[in-house]
Amino acid sequence: MPELPEVELTRRRLERELTGKRIDRVVVRTPKLRFPIPQELHVSLPGRTVRSVGRRGKYLLFDCETGWLIVHLGMTGFLRLVAGTAPPGKHDHLDIVFADGTVLRFHDPRKFGTVAWTTDAPATHPLLAAIGPEPLTATFDGAYLFAVTRTRRVAVKQLLMNAAIVAGVGNIYANEALFRAGIRPDRPASSLGRPECERLARTVREVLQESIDQGSTYRVEEETVAYHPLNFDVYGRGTDACTRCGGALEEIRLGNRSTVFCPRCQT
């Protein structure tokens, strides 16, 4: 699943390539993904110019003069820039065709992605209104994390993956941040002390920023997108040896998600 770094890299590429371009038409091949694709796109988008591409959590926000196109890539989705002559594939559900012939194509095999349209401020849209602070901003720090964990006994990893607590932290980077912070993922969030919250807020920022930095060669137009450029310490490593102590990692399920940690290094 594309997480915050992958969405941010997509945003940067699309803003660089699409800002200032005028939309000619919209082609919808699959009327319903996670939710129905708004019919008004056929009327609202043609003739409009992309002014910027923003991001809120894992959502991409296209400023199209009179409104905002909101896109979530879901579990398997990605956006490609292709030539207008490129034939669509089986899972290419939406094309936004620009006046210069460029096509922004939404590919999503599992159809869990979302496309929405709003003429109001994006922050007020139901998809975005309840999202928590961005983890790479000053509003997400140890003091904030300490405050929101006081009454929550849910596992700390599940708390990190709750978009209402912090935006855009998924399974991959929650695993990695907790390892760096030395905190077991299944610990009740309320058991964390202030120093642990400070440490965890810092490692969340570190793993996200490092992944963005290492993904500088990410290319949104490639069909086989190389997500997750970070060299992982625990994610996807099952019972391999810990990169820090050499002991065996453990794999458990939390919230129906695979969770890997080191029982020696994380307490």
From Swiss-Prot:
Binds 1 zinc ion per subunit. The active site is at 2 (schiff-base intermediate with dna), 3 (proton donor), 58 (proton donor), 257 (proton donor). Pfam families: Fapy_DNA_glyco, H2TH, zf-FPG_IleRS. Monomer. One of its GO terms (biological process) is base-excision repair. It comes from the Bacteria. Its cofactor is Zn(2+). Belongs to the FPG family. SUPFAM superfamilies: Glucocorticoid receptor-like (DNA-binding domain), N-terminal domain of MutM-like DNA repair proteins, S13-like H2TH domain. DNA binds at residues 91, 110, 152. InterPro entries: DNA_glyclase/AP_lyase_DNA-bd, DNA_glyclase_Znf_dom_DNA_BS, Formamido-pyr_DNA_Glyclase, FPG_cat, MutM-like_N-ter, Ribosomal_uS13-like_H2TH, Znf_DNA_glyclase/AP_lyase, Znf_FPG/IleRS. Keywords: DNA damage, DNA repair, DNA-binding, Glycosidase, Hydrolase, Lyase, Metal-binding, Multifunctional enzyme, Zinc, Zinc-finger. CDD domains: EcFpg-like_N. This is Formamidopyrimidine-DNA glycosylase. It catalyses: Hydrolysis of DNA containing ring-opened 7-methylguanine residues, releasing 2,6-diamino-4-hydroxy-5-(N-methyl)formamidopyrimidine; 2'-deoxyribonucleotide-(2'-deoxyribose 5'-phosphate)-2'-deoxyribonucleotide-DNA = a 3'-end 2'-deoxyribonucleotide-(2,3-dehydro-2,3-deoxyribose 5'-phosphate)-DNA + a 5'-end 5'-phospho-2'-deoxyribonucleoside-DNA + H(+). Involved in base excision repair of DNA damaged by oxidation or by mutagenic agents. Acts as a DNA glycosylase that recognizes and removes damaged bases. Has a preference for oxidized purines, such as 7,8-dihydro-8-oxoguanine (8-oxoG). Has AP (apurinic/apyrimidinic) lyase activity and introduces nicks in the DNA strand. Cleaves the DNA backbone by beta-delta elimination to generate a single-strand break at the site of the removed base with both 3'- and 5'-phosphates. Its EC number is 3.2.2.23, 4.2.99.18. One of its GO terms (molecular function) is zinc ion binding. A zinc finger (FPG-type) spans 233-267. Transmembrane segments: none annotated. It comes from Geobacter metallireducens (strain ATCC 53774 / DSM 7210 / GS-15).
